[in-house]
Amino acid sequence: MKKTTLALGMHDKLFKRARTMYQIEHCICDLLMTKGFLRIETPTLEHFEVFSDVVDNGNYNFFDKNGDLISLRPDITSQIGRVIASTQVHTPIKFSYSGKVFNYNEEMRGLSNEHTQAGVEIIGFPVHQALEEAVISAKEALDVAGVRNYKFEFSHAQLLQLIFEELNLPAVKEAELATYIRDKSITGLKEFTKENPSQYDKVLEQLPSLFGETTAVLTEARQLTDNESFLTALDSLEVLTSRLADNLPETTLDLAQLPAVPYYTGIMFKVFGDKVPDAFVSGGRYDKLFERFGATELTAVGWAIDIDSVYQAVHDDVEFGGDMDD
């Protein structure tokens, strides 16, 4: 029976889906190369340490014939960090890429474990320039892919990092707080601040409401703390969204946005659309990634677009003349 069944979380892509996803991927890649991003391809298999210092059960891990622990790549950004640290590549430099990534989801969640991504990494450039180029190139990629009615949502990794550092919680309590933040649990966060008081009590209690139109969220957040580092992070969000106003007249913030990956250190962004429940673009600043590989800190901004999700967003607009439509 297993000869004809798929492994957990894997799917065949047929006809309309296969053709459309191929076209989306190549349109985005061609666009990025014309904008000066150098194409890079990295291996599907890597030593597990490239992605994490400890074995991550969310990754596909196995031992090769030499006894080395190998992972199917869960992301490509970490691999580019390895490339920068281990080769003679000179910075500043801009990369573009596309390829398969793999994340293990439990069977009951019903999620796909294989995705096609395309993305960019902008390394060694002035941070404001890199952030603007990253956001604008992500917008252009969505446009060339035919996505309509999408919105950029921004946050800053340092906001929650400051709170977690101040609280200095044991791992179990840290995970509990992260769950309350992710779920926007008003009751959970209020109870948590009673048990774990800090200078950020007001911020934590209001986090579930600190999302929406950029100016309104910034105004409310600034009234909740006088911590200089926290306010500086808010200022950087205001500066970036103001500089992007001509390209993105409408932006939103979500200050409760937890980093999608652990290496984000600054401004982060996601893109949401009408027809897809989750973000189909995620990106941000990750200056400290290279230190994991023994290299010096570099300014770095990147994003990845999920081609599978983009297909869901444009599916209804794509005509297909074949015998089967998936």
Curated annotation (Swiss-Prot):
User: A GO molecular-function term, please?
Assistant: histidine-tRNA ligase activity
Annotated metabolic or biological route of this protein: Amino-acid biosynthesis; L-histidine biosynthesis; L-histidine from 5-phospho-alpha-D-ribose 1-diphosphate: step 1/9
- Which example biological process does GO assign this protein? L-histidine biosynthetic process
Q: Keyword Cytoplasm, does the record have it?
A: yes
Pfam families (alphabetical): tRNA-synt_His (PF13393)
Task: Quote the cellular component terms of the Gene Ontology held in the record.
Answer: cytoplasm
Q: Keywords of this protein's UniProt record, alphabetized?
A: Amino-acid biosynthesis, Cytoplasm, Histidine biosynthesis
Q: Does the keyword Cytoplasm apply?
A: yes
Q: Where in the cell is it found?
A: Cytoplasm
Write down the InterPro entries for this protein, in alphabetical order.
aa-tRNA-synth_II/BPL/LPL (IPR045864), HisRS-like_core (IPR041715), HisRS/HisZ (IPR004516), HisZ (IPR004517)
Q: Which CDD domains match?
A: HisRS-like_core (cd00773)
Checking SUPFAM superfamilies in the record gives: Class II aaRS and biotin synthetases (SSF55681)
Q: What does this protein do?
A: Required for the first step of histidine biosynthesis. May allow the feedback regulation of ATP phosphoribosyltransferase activity by histidine.
Return the similarity comment: Belongs to the class-II aminoacyl-tRNA synthetase family. HisZ subfamily.
How is this protein organized at the quaternary level?
A: Heteromultimer composed of HisG and HisZ subunits.
Q: Which HAMAP family match?
A: HisZ
Tell me more from the record.
This function is generally fulfilled by the C-terminal part of HisG, which is missing in some bacteria such as this one.
Designated name of the protein: ATP phosphoribosyltransferase regulatory subunit
Highest classification ranks of the organism: Bacteria, Bacillati, Bacillota, Bacilli, Lactobacillales
Q: Which gene encodes it?
A: hisZ
